[in-house]
């Protein structure tokens, strides 16, 4: 039954776009705790985690309904988040729910060991009975509590899993033949991972369909979201998840792109060197999430995290937070954000004071101030039509099956650190080309390739799950597109049991079917350039990993792409540089690349406020070095400089009032943090009162920009500011 449902969902060619009319939530965060003054970051909404909290919580657990009330009483919109693959579900595993033990439903590796998320918290094989439990004991309860937005996070099946009795039963139901050990052949690996992917697609469909139906009985329009890592990260971490196929589910209203330092610091190869490239990886991860959902019109939140799961030092957190934060803002079509996960961990946790020290401390005041300036900028960050600087129109094709070939490994196939993907992306990204990704599963959607001039693709590391995609690719080339196919097609996954070699099809490779659609009928296409209709395709018989695992070995790909881009793409010259810039309203973003065409810094000039400096200085000129990023407020672009306004602040501004020569507001932010604000005024203040005390200081007034720098201790109760000039 699952197989029939999954196939029907995968073959849907149209998507249900969910209008977010009147949606009041632009910023959100997740917390398993009740409201506390130390974590009151003033986003629009809070996703209260788990009816039983977070399994890793060590403190006393407050009942779910009490946690909800505590946040509502402070003015927050309350949503719900829990894990679909793991969670505080001991009542299910130990038999308290239905009288039967279910620990045997955990994901199991080849050694027979259960894969645990925490104590008594296994990663789950999502059986029908487990889904019944999730619906009855969790989804129903939160809807009864009046919550109309449900976030089911991280539908994850480990690639190394696949040996439990529960999984073997699901295999038999899905494929109709007995389970096969995935480590014994590439085909078994592919089939095993394909099933894992289908199981969680089905799980989310079941749970969300129930949530919407039950909500209707209560007169509620329940929205359902999936917080998920990117396809790139799951592939690198050897985890299988539904990813792009979630777009085929009408019951999914949106997503959270779970990208942060922890995912983006996974090393990759470039120019023969494997190392962390946090900014570049984050840029590609956010891009994969945007392209996965853009054709659907559904809501997408981008996540950043000021720290990460792995314990490191505060300086490391700050540097990489700035890199990921800048990367997310370089997507001007996305303007909704999860500003942080687990504020209780960020504000109250203890982390190293330096990389060489074992001494730990809570978040330094300078970093909490900077972080709050950054997250409060997200409350005002506009969606814009502006473009990231650089030559546009180069895209890389992705498919969900990228996750299927990662593990177990087999003779004849090696893809170190996902090099077959990064081999197509990094040679361009490192030269300042803002490459995009396109998802094979979305090709049926109108305009999926509208912004693509040259499409790079490879079946070395992934395979097409349906033949229909090839018709869309062929039609796109026929109408003038340029396709570069880059693969030897010699990997052992070419011959796995799939549509291209079953049901009467006898293609040795899936690419044979694609090239046949474009007029080649001689089996394995030879390297070279071919014309089809108004377009061109080029077959390059190299696996993309060769361009990055070896030093100075990407020139052939670069030259070929440049030649076709300029001759056939109708896009002018392919520009190489060592930076990206973007303008979003009054905000300026700059990222300068290392390992690029130049080591020159990028110079900015103007009247700027540096948001990555907790002192919010006025900057008139700055050189940004390679491997550095910056975010500025450009005062020169403020539309109405006679209007008093807070341009940057480490608190959220409420109740603004401006009459004549007076401006007042209330600032709110967590206790035990320091606020700094730069305020634009028509004239120099004569009086500046903070909570009934005169605090004006001549030294804090900048005559040229007509801005005042104000500092005080934050309070979640609100600090009242009254200015006269």
Can you say where each PLM-predicted feature lies in the sequence?
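A conserved amphipathic helix/loop scaffold
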Residues: 463-660, 668, 677-679
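Aromatic- and acidic-residue-enriched segments that line the glycan-binding/catalytic groove
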Residues: 87-116, 153-184, 239, 413-414, ...
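Hydrophobic targeting/anchoring helices
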Residues: 36-44, 49-50, 153, 215, ...
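The substrate-binding groove and active-site-proximal loops of carbohydrate-active enzymes
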Residues: 47-59, 115-135, 185-203, 228-230, ...
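Active-site-adjacent "subsite" loops/lids of carbohydrate-active enzymes
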Residues: 80, 84-145, 179-197, 205-206
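Glycine-rich, aromatic-flanked loop segments that form ligand/cofactor-binding clefts
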Residues: 63-117, 148-159, 211, 215-226
């Amino acid at each position: 039954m699952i197989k029939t449902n999954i196939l029907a969902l995968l073959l849907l060619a149209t998507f249900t776009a969910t209008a977010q009319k009147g949606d009041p939530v632009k910023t959100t965060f997740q917390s398993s705790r009740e409201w506390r003054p130390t974590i009151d970051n003033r986003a629009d909404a809070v996703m209260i985690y788990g009816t039983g909290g977070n399994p890793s919580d060590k403190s006393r657990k407050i009942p779910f309904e009490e946690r909800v009330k505590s946040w509502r009483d402070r003015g927050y919109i309350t949503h719900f988040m829990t894990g679909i693959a793991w969670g505080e579900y001991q009542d299910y595993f130990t038999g308290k729910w239905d009288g039967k033990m279910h620990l045997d439903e955990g994901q199991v590796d080849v050694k027979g060991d259960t894969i645990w998320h925490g104590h008594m918290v296994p990663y789950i094989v999502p059986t029908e009975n487990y889904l019944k439990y999730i619906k009855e004991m969790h989804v129903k309860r939160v809807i009864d509590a009046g919550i109309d937005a449900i976030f089911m996070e991280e539908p994850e099946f480990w690639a190394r899993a696949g040996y439990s009795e529960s999984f073997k039963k699901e295999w038999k139901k899905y494929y109709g033949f007995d389970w096969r050990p995935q480590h014994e052949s590439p085909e078994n690996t592919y089939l095993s991972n394909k099933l894992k992917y289908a199981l969680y697609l089905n799980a989310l469909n079941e749970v969300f369909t129930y949530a919407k139906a039950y909500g209707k009985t209560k007169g509620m329009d329940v929205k359902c979201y999936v917080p998920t890592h990117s396809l790139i990260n799951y592939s690198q971490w050897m985890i299988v998840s539904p990813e792009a196929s979630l777009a085929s589910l009408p019951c999914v209203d949106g997503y959270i792109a779970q990208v942060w330092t922890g995912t983006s610091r996974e090393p990759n190869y470039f120019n023969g060197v494997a190392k962390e490239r946090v900014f570049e990886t984050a840029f590609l991860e956010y891009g994969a999430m945007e392209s996965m959902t853009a054709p659907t019109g559904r809501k997408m939140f981008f996540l950043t995290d000021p720290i990460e799961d792995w314990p490191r030092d505060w300086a490391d957190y700050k540097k990489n937070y700035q890199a990921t934060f800048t990367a997310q803002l370089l997507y001007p079509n996305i303007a909704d954000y999860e500003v942080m996960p687990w504020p209780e961990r960020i504000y109250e946790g203890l982390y190293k004071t330096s990389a060489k020290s074992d001494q730990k401390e809570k978040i330094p005041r300078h970093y909490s101030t900077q972080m709050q300036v950054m997250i409060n900028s997200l409350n005002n960050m506009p969606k814009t039509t502006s473009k990231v600087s650089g030559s546009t129109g180069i895209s890389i094709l992705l498919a969900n099956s990228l996750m299927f070939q990662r593990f177990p490994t087999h003779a004849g196939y090696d893809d170190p650190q996902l090099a077959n993907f990064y081999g197509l992306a990094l040679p361009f990204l490192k030269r300042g080309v803002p490459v995009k990704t396109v998802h094979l599963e979305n090709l049926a959607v109108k305009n999926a390739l509208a912004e693509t001039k040259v499409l790079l693709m490879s079946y070395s590391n992934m395979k097409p799950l349906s033949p229909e995609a090839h018709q869309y690719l062929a039609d796109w080339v026929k109408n003038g597109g340029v396709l570069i196919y880059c693969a030897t097609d010699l990997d052992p996954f070419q011959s796995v049991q799939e549509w291209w070699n079953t049901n009467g099809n006898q293609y040795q490779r899936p690419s044979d079917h694609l090239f046949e659609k474009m007029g080649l009928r001689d089996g394995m296409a030879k390297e070279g350039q071919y014309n089809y209709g108004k377009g061109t395709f080029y077959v390059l018989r190299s696996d993309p990993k060769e361009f990055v695992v070896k030093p100075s070995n990407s020139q052939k790909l670069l030259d070929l792409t440049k030649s076709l881009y300029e001759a056939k793409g109708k896009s002018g010259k392919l520009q190489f540089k060592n930076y990206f810039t973007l303008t979003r309203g009054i905000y300026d973003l700059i990222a300068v690349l290392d390992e690029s065409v130049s080591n020159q810094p990028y110079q900015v000039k103007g009247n700027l406020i540096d948001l990555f400096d907790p002192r919010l200085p006025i900057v008139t000129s700055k050189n940004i070095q390679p491997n550095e990023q910056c975010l500025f407020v450009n005062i020169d672009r403020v539309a109405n400089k006679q209007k008093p306004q807070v341009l940057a602040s480490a608190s959220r501004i409420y109740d603004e009032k401006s009459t004549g020569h007076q401006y007042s507001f209330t600032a709110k932010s967590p206790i035990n943090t320091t606020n700094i604000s730069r305020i634009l005024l028509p004239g120099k203040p004569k009086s500046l009162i903070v909570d009934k005390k005169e605090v004006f200081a001549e030294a804090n007034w900048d005559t040229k920009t007509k801005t005042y720098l104000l500092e005080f201790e934050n309070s979640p109760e609100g600090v009242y500011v009254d200015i006269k000039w």
